[in-house]
């Protein structure tokens, strides 16, 4: 029933028979995917499974890939955040957020920084910020453009555990306010279950697991249904979980 419901809803992302390869290696193998408007999808997979390749294809950043085929339909308004915040070190924080926004940029950028808890840091240099603060700036830069599709490639992977928890809460609040469609690439199964409406597992260029996470938020690790999803997803990743 969940699969049918996904097909009936308007799709923000539609992928058909997507192929991406490097040399003799096929990374994405005739992959199909629909993501409805406003859905938060987390993408799991082993290293080399094609997660970042798919995200880069959706972002239009893989124009130099030789082995390619299939079709992609995505909104024009797309923003991307990476594990590395990719702030320009020669620009102050506000200028990083507002780059390319035009005359209304200053007020919009200041509001976006306030939204991520960095009011008053507009004139700071990126080097003066902690890793968590830099990722907050990256989120502000992405969402100030009001994207219809937000792509995030392990944006919290380099942060400590406490900062990650805080960033999870911030991301959920920002998504609630701005309501983009989201694709989050992560290696963290618990992060995927805690945040997403739907979790995919990519293996050998194909989606092998597609789960709707129907647990009310906030989601607790100790919840029995959380454990069931965790066991299923870890199993798909080749990790055995001891019975409880």
Swiss-Prot record:
SS bond partners: none
Reactions accelerated catalytically: ATP + H2O + aliphatic sulfonate-[sulfonate-binding protein]Side 1 = ADP + phosphate + aliphatic sulfonateSide 2 + [sulfonate-binding protein]Side 1
Main location: membrane
ABC transporter domain mapped to chain residues: 13-229
Localisation: Cell membrane
UniProt-listed Enzyme Commission number(s): 7.6.2.14
Protein name in UniProt: Aliphatic sulfonates import ATP-binding protein SsuB 2
Keywords (A to Z) from UniProt: ATP-binding, Cell membrane, Membrane, Nucleotide-binding, Translocase, Transport
Entry-linked InterPro entries: AAA+_ATPase, ABC_transporter-like_ATP-bd, ABC_transporter-like_CS, ABC_transporter_ATP-bind, P-loop_NTPase
Molecular function terms, GO-annotated: ATP binding; ATP hydrolysis activity
One term under GO cellular component: plasma membrane
Residues that coordinate or bind ATP: 45-52
Top-level taxonomic group: Bacteria
Family the UniProt entry places it in: Belongs to the ABC transporter superfamily. Aliphatic sulfonates importer (TC 3.A.1.17.2) family.
Its membrane topology: Peripheral membrane protein
SMART domains xref list: AAA (SM00382)
Protein's organism: Rhodococcus jostii (strain RHA1)
Physiological role: Part of the ABC transporter complex SsuABC involved in aliphatic sulfonates import. Responsible for energy coupling to the transport system.
Subunit note: The complex is composed of two ATP-binding proteins (SsuB), two transmembrane proteins (SsuC) and a solute-binding protein (SsuA).
């Amino acid at each position: 029933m969940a699969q049918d419901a996904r097909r009936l809803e308007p799709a923000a992302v539609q992928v058909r028979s997507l192929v991406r390869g490097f040399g003799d290696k096929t990374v994405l193998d005739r992959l199909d995917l629909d993501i409805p408007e406003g859905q938060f999808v987390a993408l799991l997979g082993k290293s080399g499974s094609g997660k970042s390749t798919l995200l880069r294809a959706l972002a239009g950043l893989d124009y130099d890939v030789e082995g390619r085929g299939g079709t992609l339909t995505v909104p024009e308004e797309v923003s991307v955040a990476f594990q590395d915040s990719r702030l320009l070190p020669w620009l102050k924080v506000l200028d990083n957020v507002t780059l390319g926004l035009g005359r209304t940029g200053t007020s919009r950028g200041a509001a976006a920084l306030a939204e991520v808890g960095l009011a008053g840091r507009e004139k700071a240099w990126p080097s003066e910020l902690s890793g968590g603060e830099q990722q907050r700036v990256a989120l502000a830069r992405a969402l100030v453009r009001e994207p219809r599709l937000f792509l995030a490639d392990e944006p919290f992977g380099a942060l400590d555990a406490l900062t990650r928890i805080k960033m999870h809460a911030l991301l959920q609040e920002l998504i609630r306010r701005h309501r983009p469609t989201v694709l989050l690439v992560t290696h963290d199964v618990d992060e995927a279950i805690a945040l997403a409406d739907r979790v995919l597992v990519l293996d050998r260029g194909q989606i092998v697991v597609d789960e709707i996470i129907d647990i009310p938020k906030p989601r607790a690790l100790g919840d029995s249904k959380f454990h069931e999803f965790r066991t299923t997803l870890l199993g798909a990743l080749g990790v055995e979980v001891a019975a409880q």
